[in-house]
Amino acid sequence: MELRPVWFDSLGAKSMCVLVRTPDLALLIDPGAAIMQPRYPAPDALKAYYLNLATRAIRNAAADATHIAITHYHYDHFRPDIPELFAGKTMWIKDPNRWINRSQWGRARAFLSSLVESVGGKYRERSSAMAEYPDPLDALPLAAQSDRRADLIAKWRKRFVGLTKLWGEGSWVDAAGFAGRIAFADARTFTIGDTTVRFTAPMFHGIESVSYTHL
């Protein structure tokens, strides 16, 4: 197996894009890059310069990839503005329907609806599936017992209840519409030849960020 960092930089354009090669596939993970936040002490022109370099490197890597994985919908991990990156690829992506925050819920839908021309298939939505969503903070008893964070925890639980309503009542994106070119990868394993790619269940980022990803 060969692992090649495509673009790792936080000096002007943040990214964490990796190309993994095996005899069976070439998997591009998180093909995204974004300009550093305004408070980062670098001129805008320098940030744009690094973003252009990152975009060029990601385009070149995507040309060699057979598969693409997107762990979550932050712009330094995917580039919805360059749909041609995804043309002809099999995509394993973060489930856009659950264990996802509101901003990424919307980003995922805009992204997937824009991919029909480059990836194929049809963008479809369906009724949500009934499910129970345990509060991930319940698995972190030490964090939950911190008196100094009591107010923050209370705010988190209120937001979490709102998210479970979104997941349970909002329309879900139907992966079947993409005819096998796009799969929601949370907690799934894929086998291509002698290569096995395993994705974890969504990882909780903490009560401050209310975000989820997987590896």
Name each model feature, range by range.
Residues 1-53, 155-205:
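Zn-dependent metallo-beta-lactamase
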Residues 24-70, 77-84, 89, 94-109, ...:
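Pre-active-site segment of Zn-dependent metallo-hydrolases
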Residues 86-208:
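Flexible, acidic/histidine-containing loops and adjacent segments that form or flank the divalent-metal
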Residues 213-214:
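Conserved small/polar residues in nucleotide/adenosyl-binding loops
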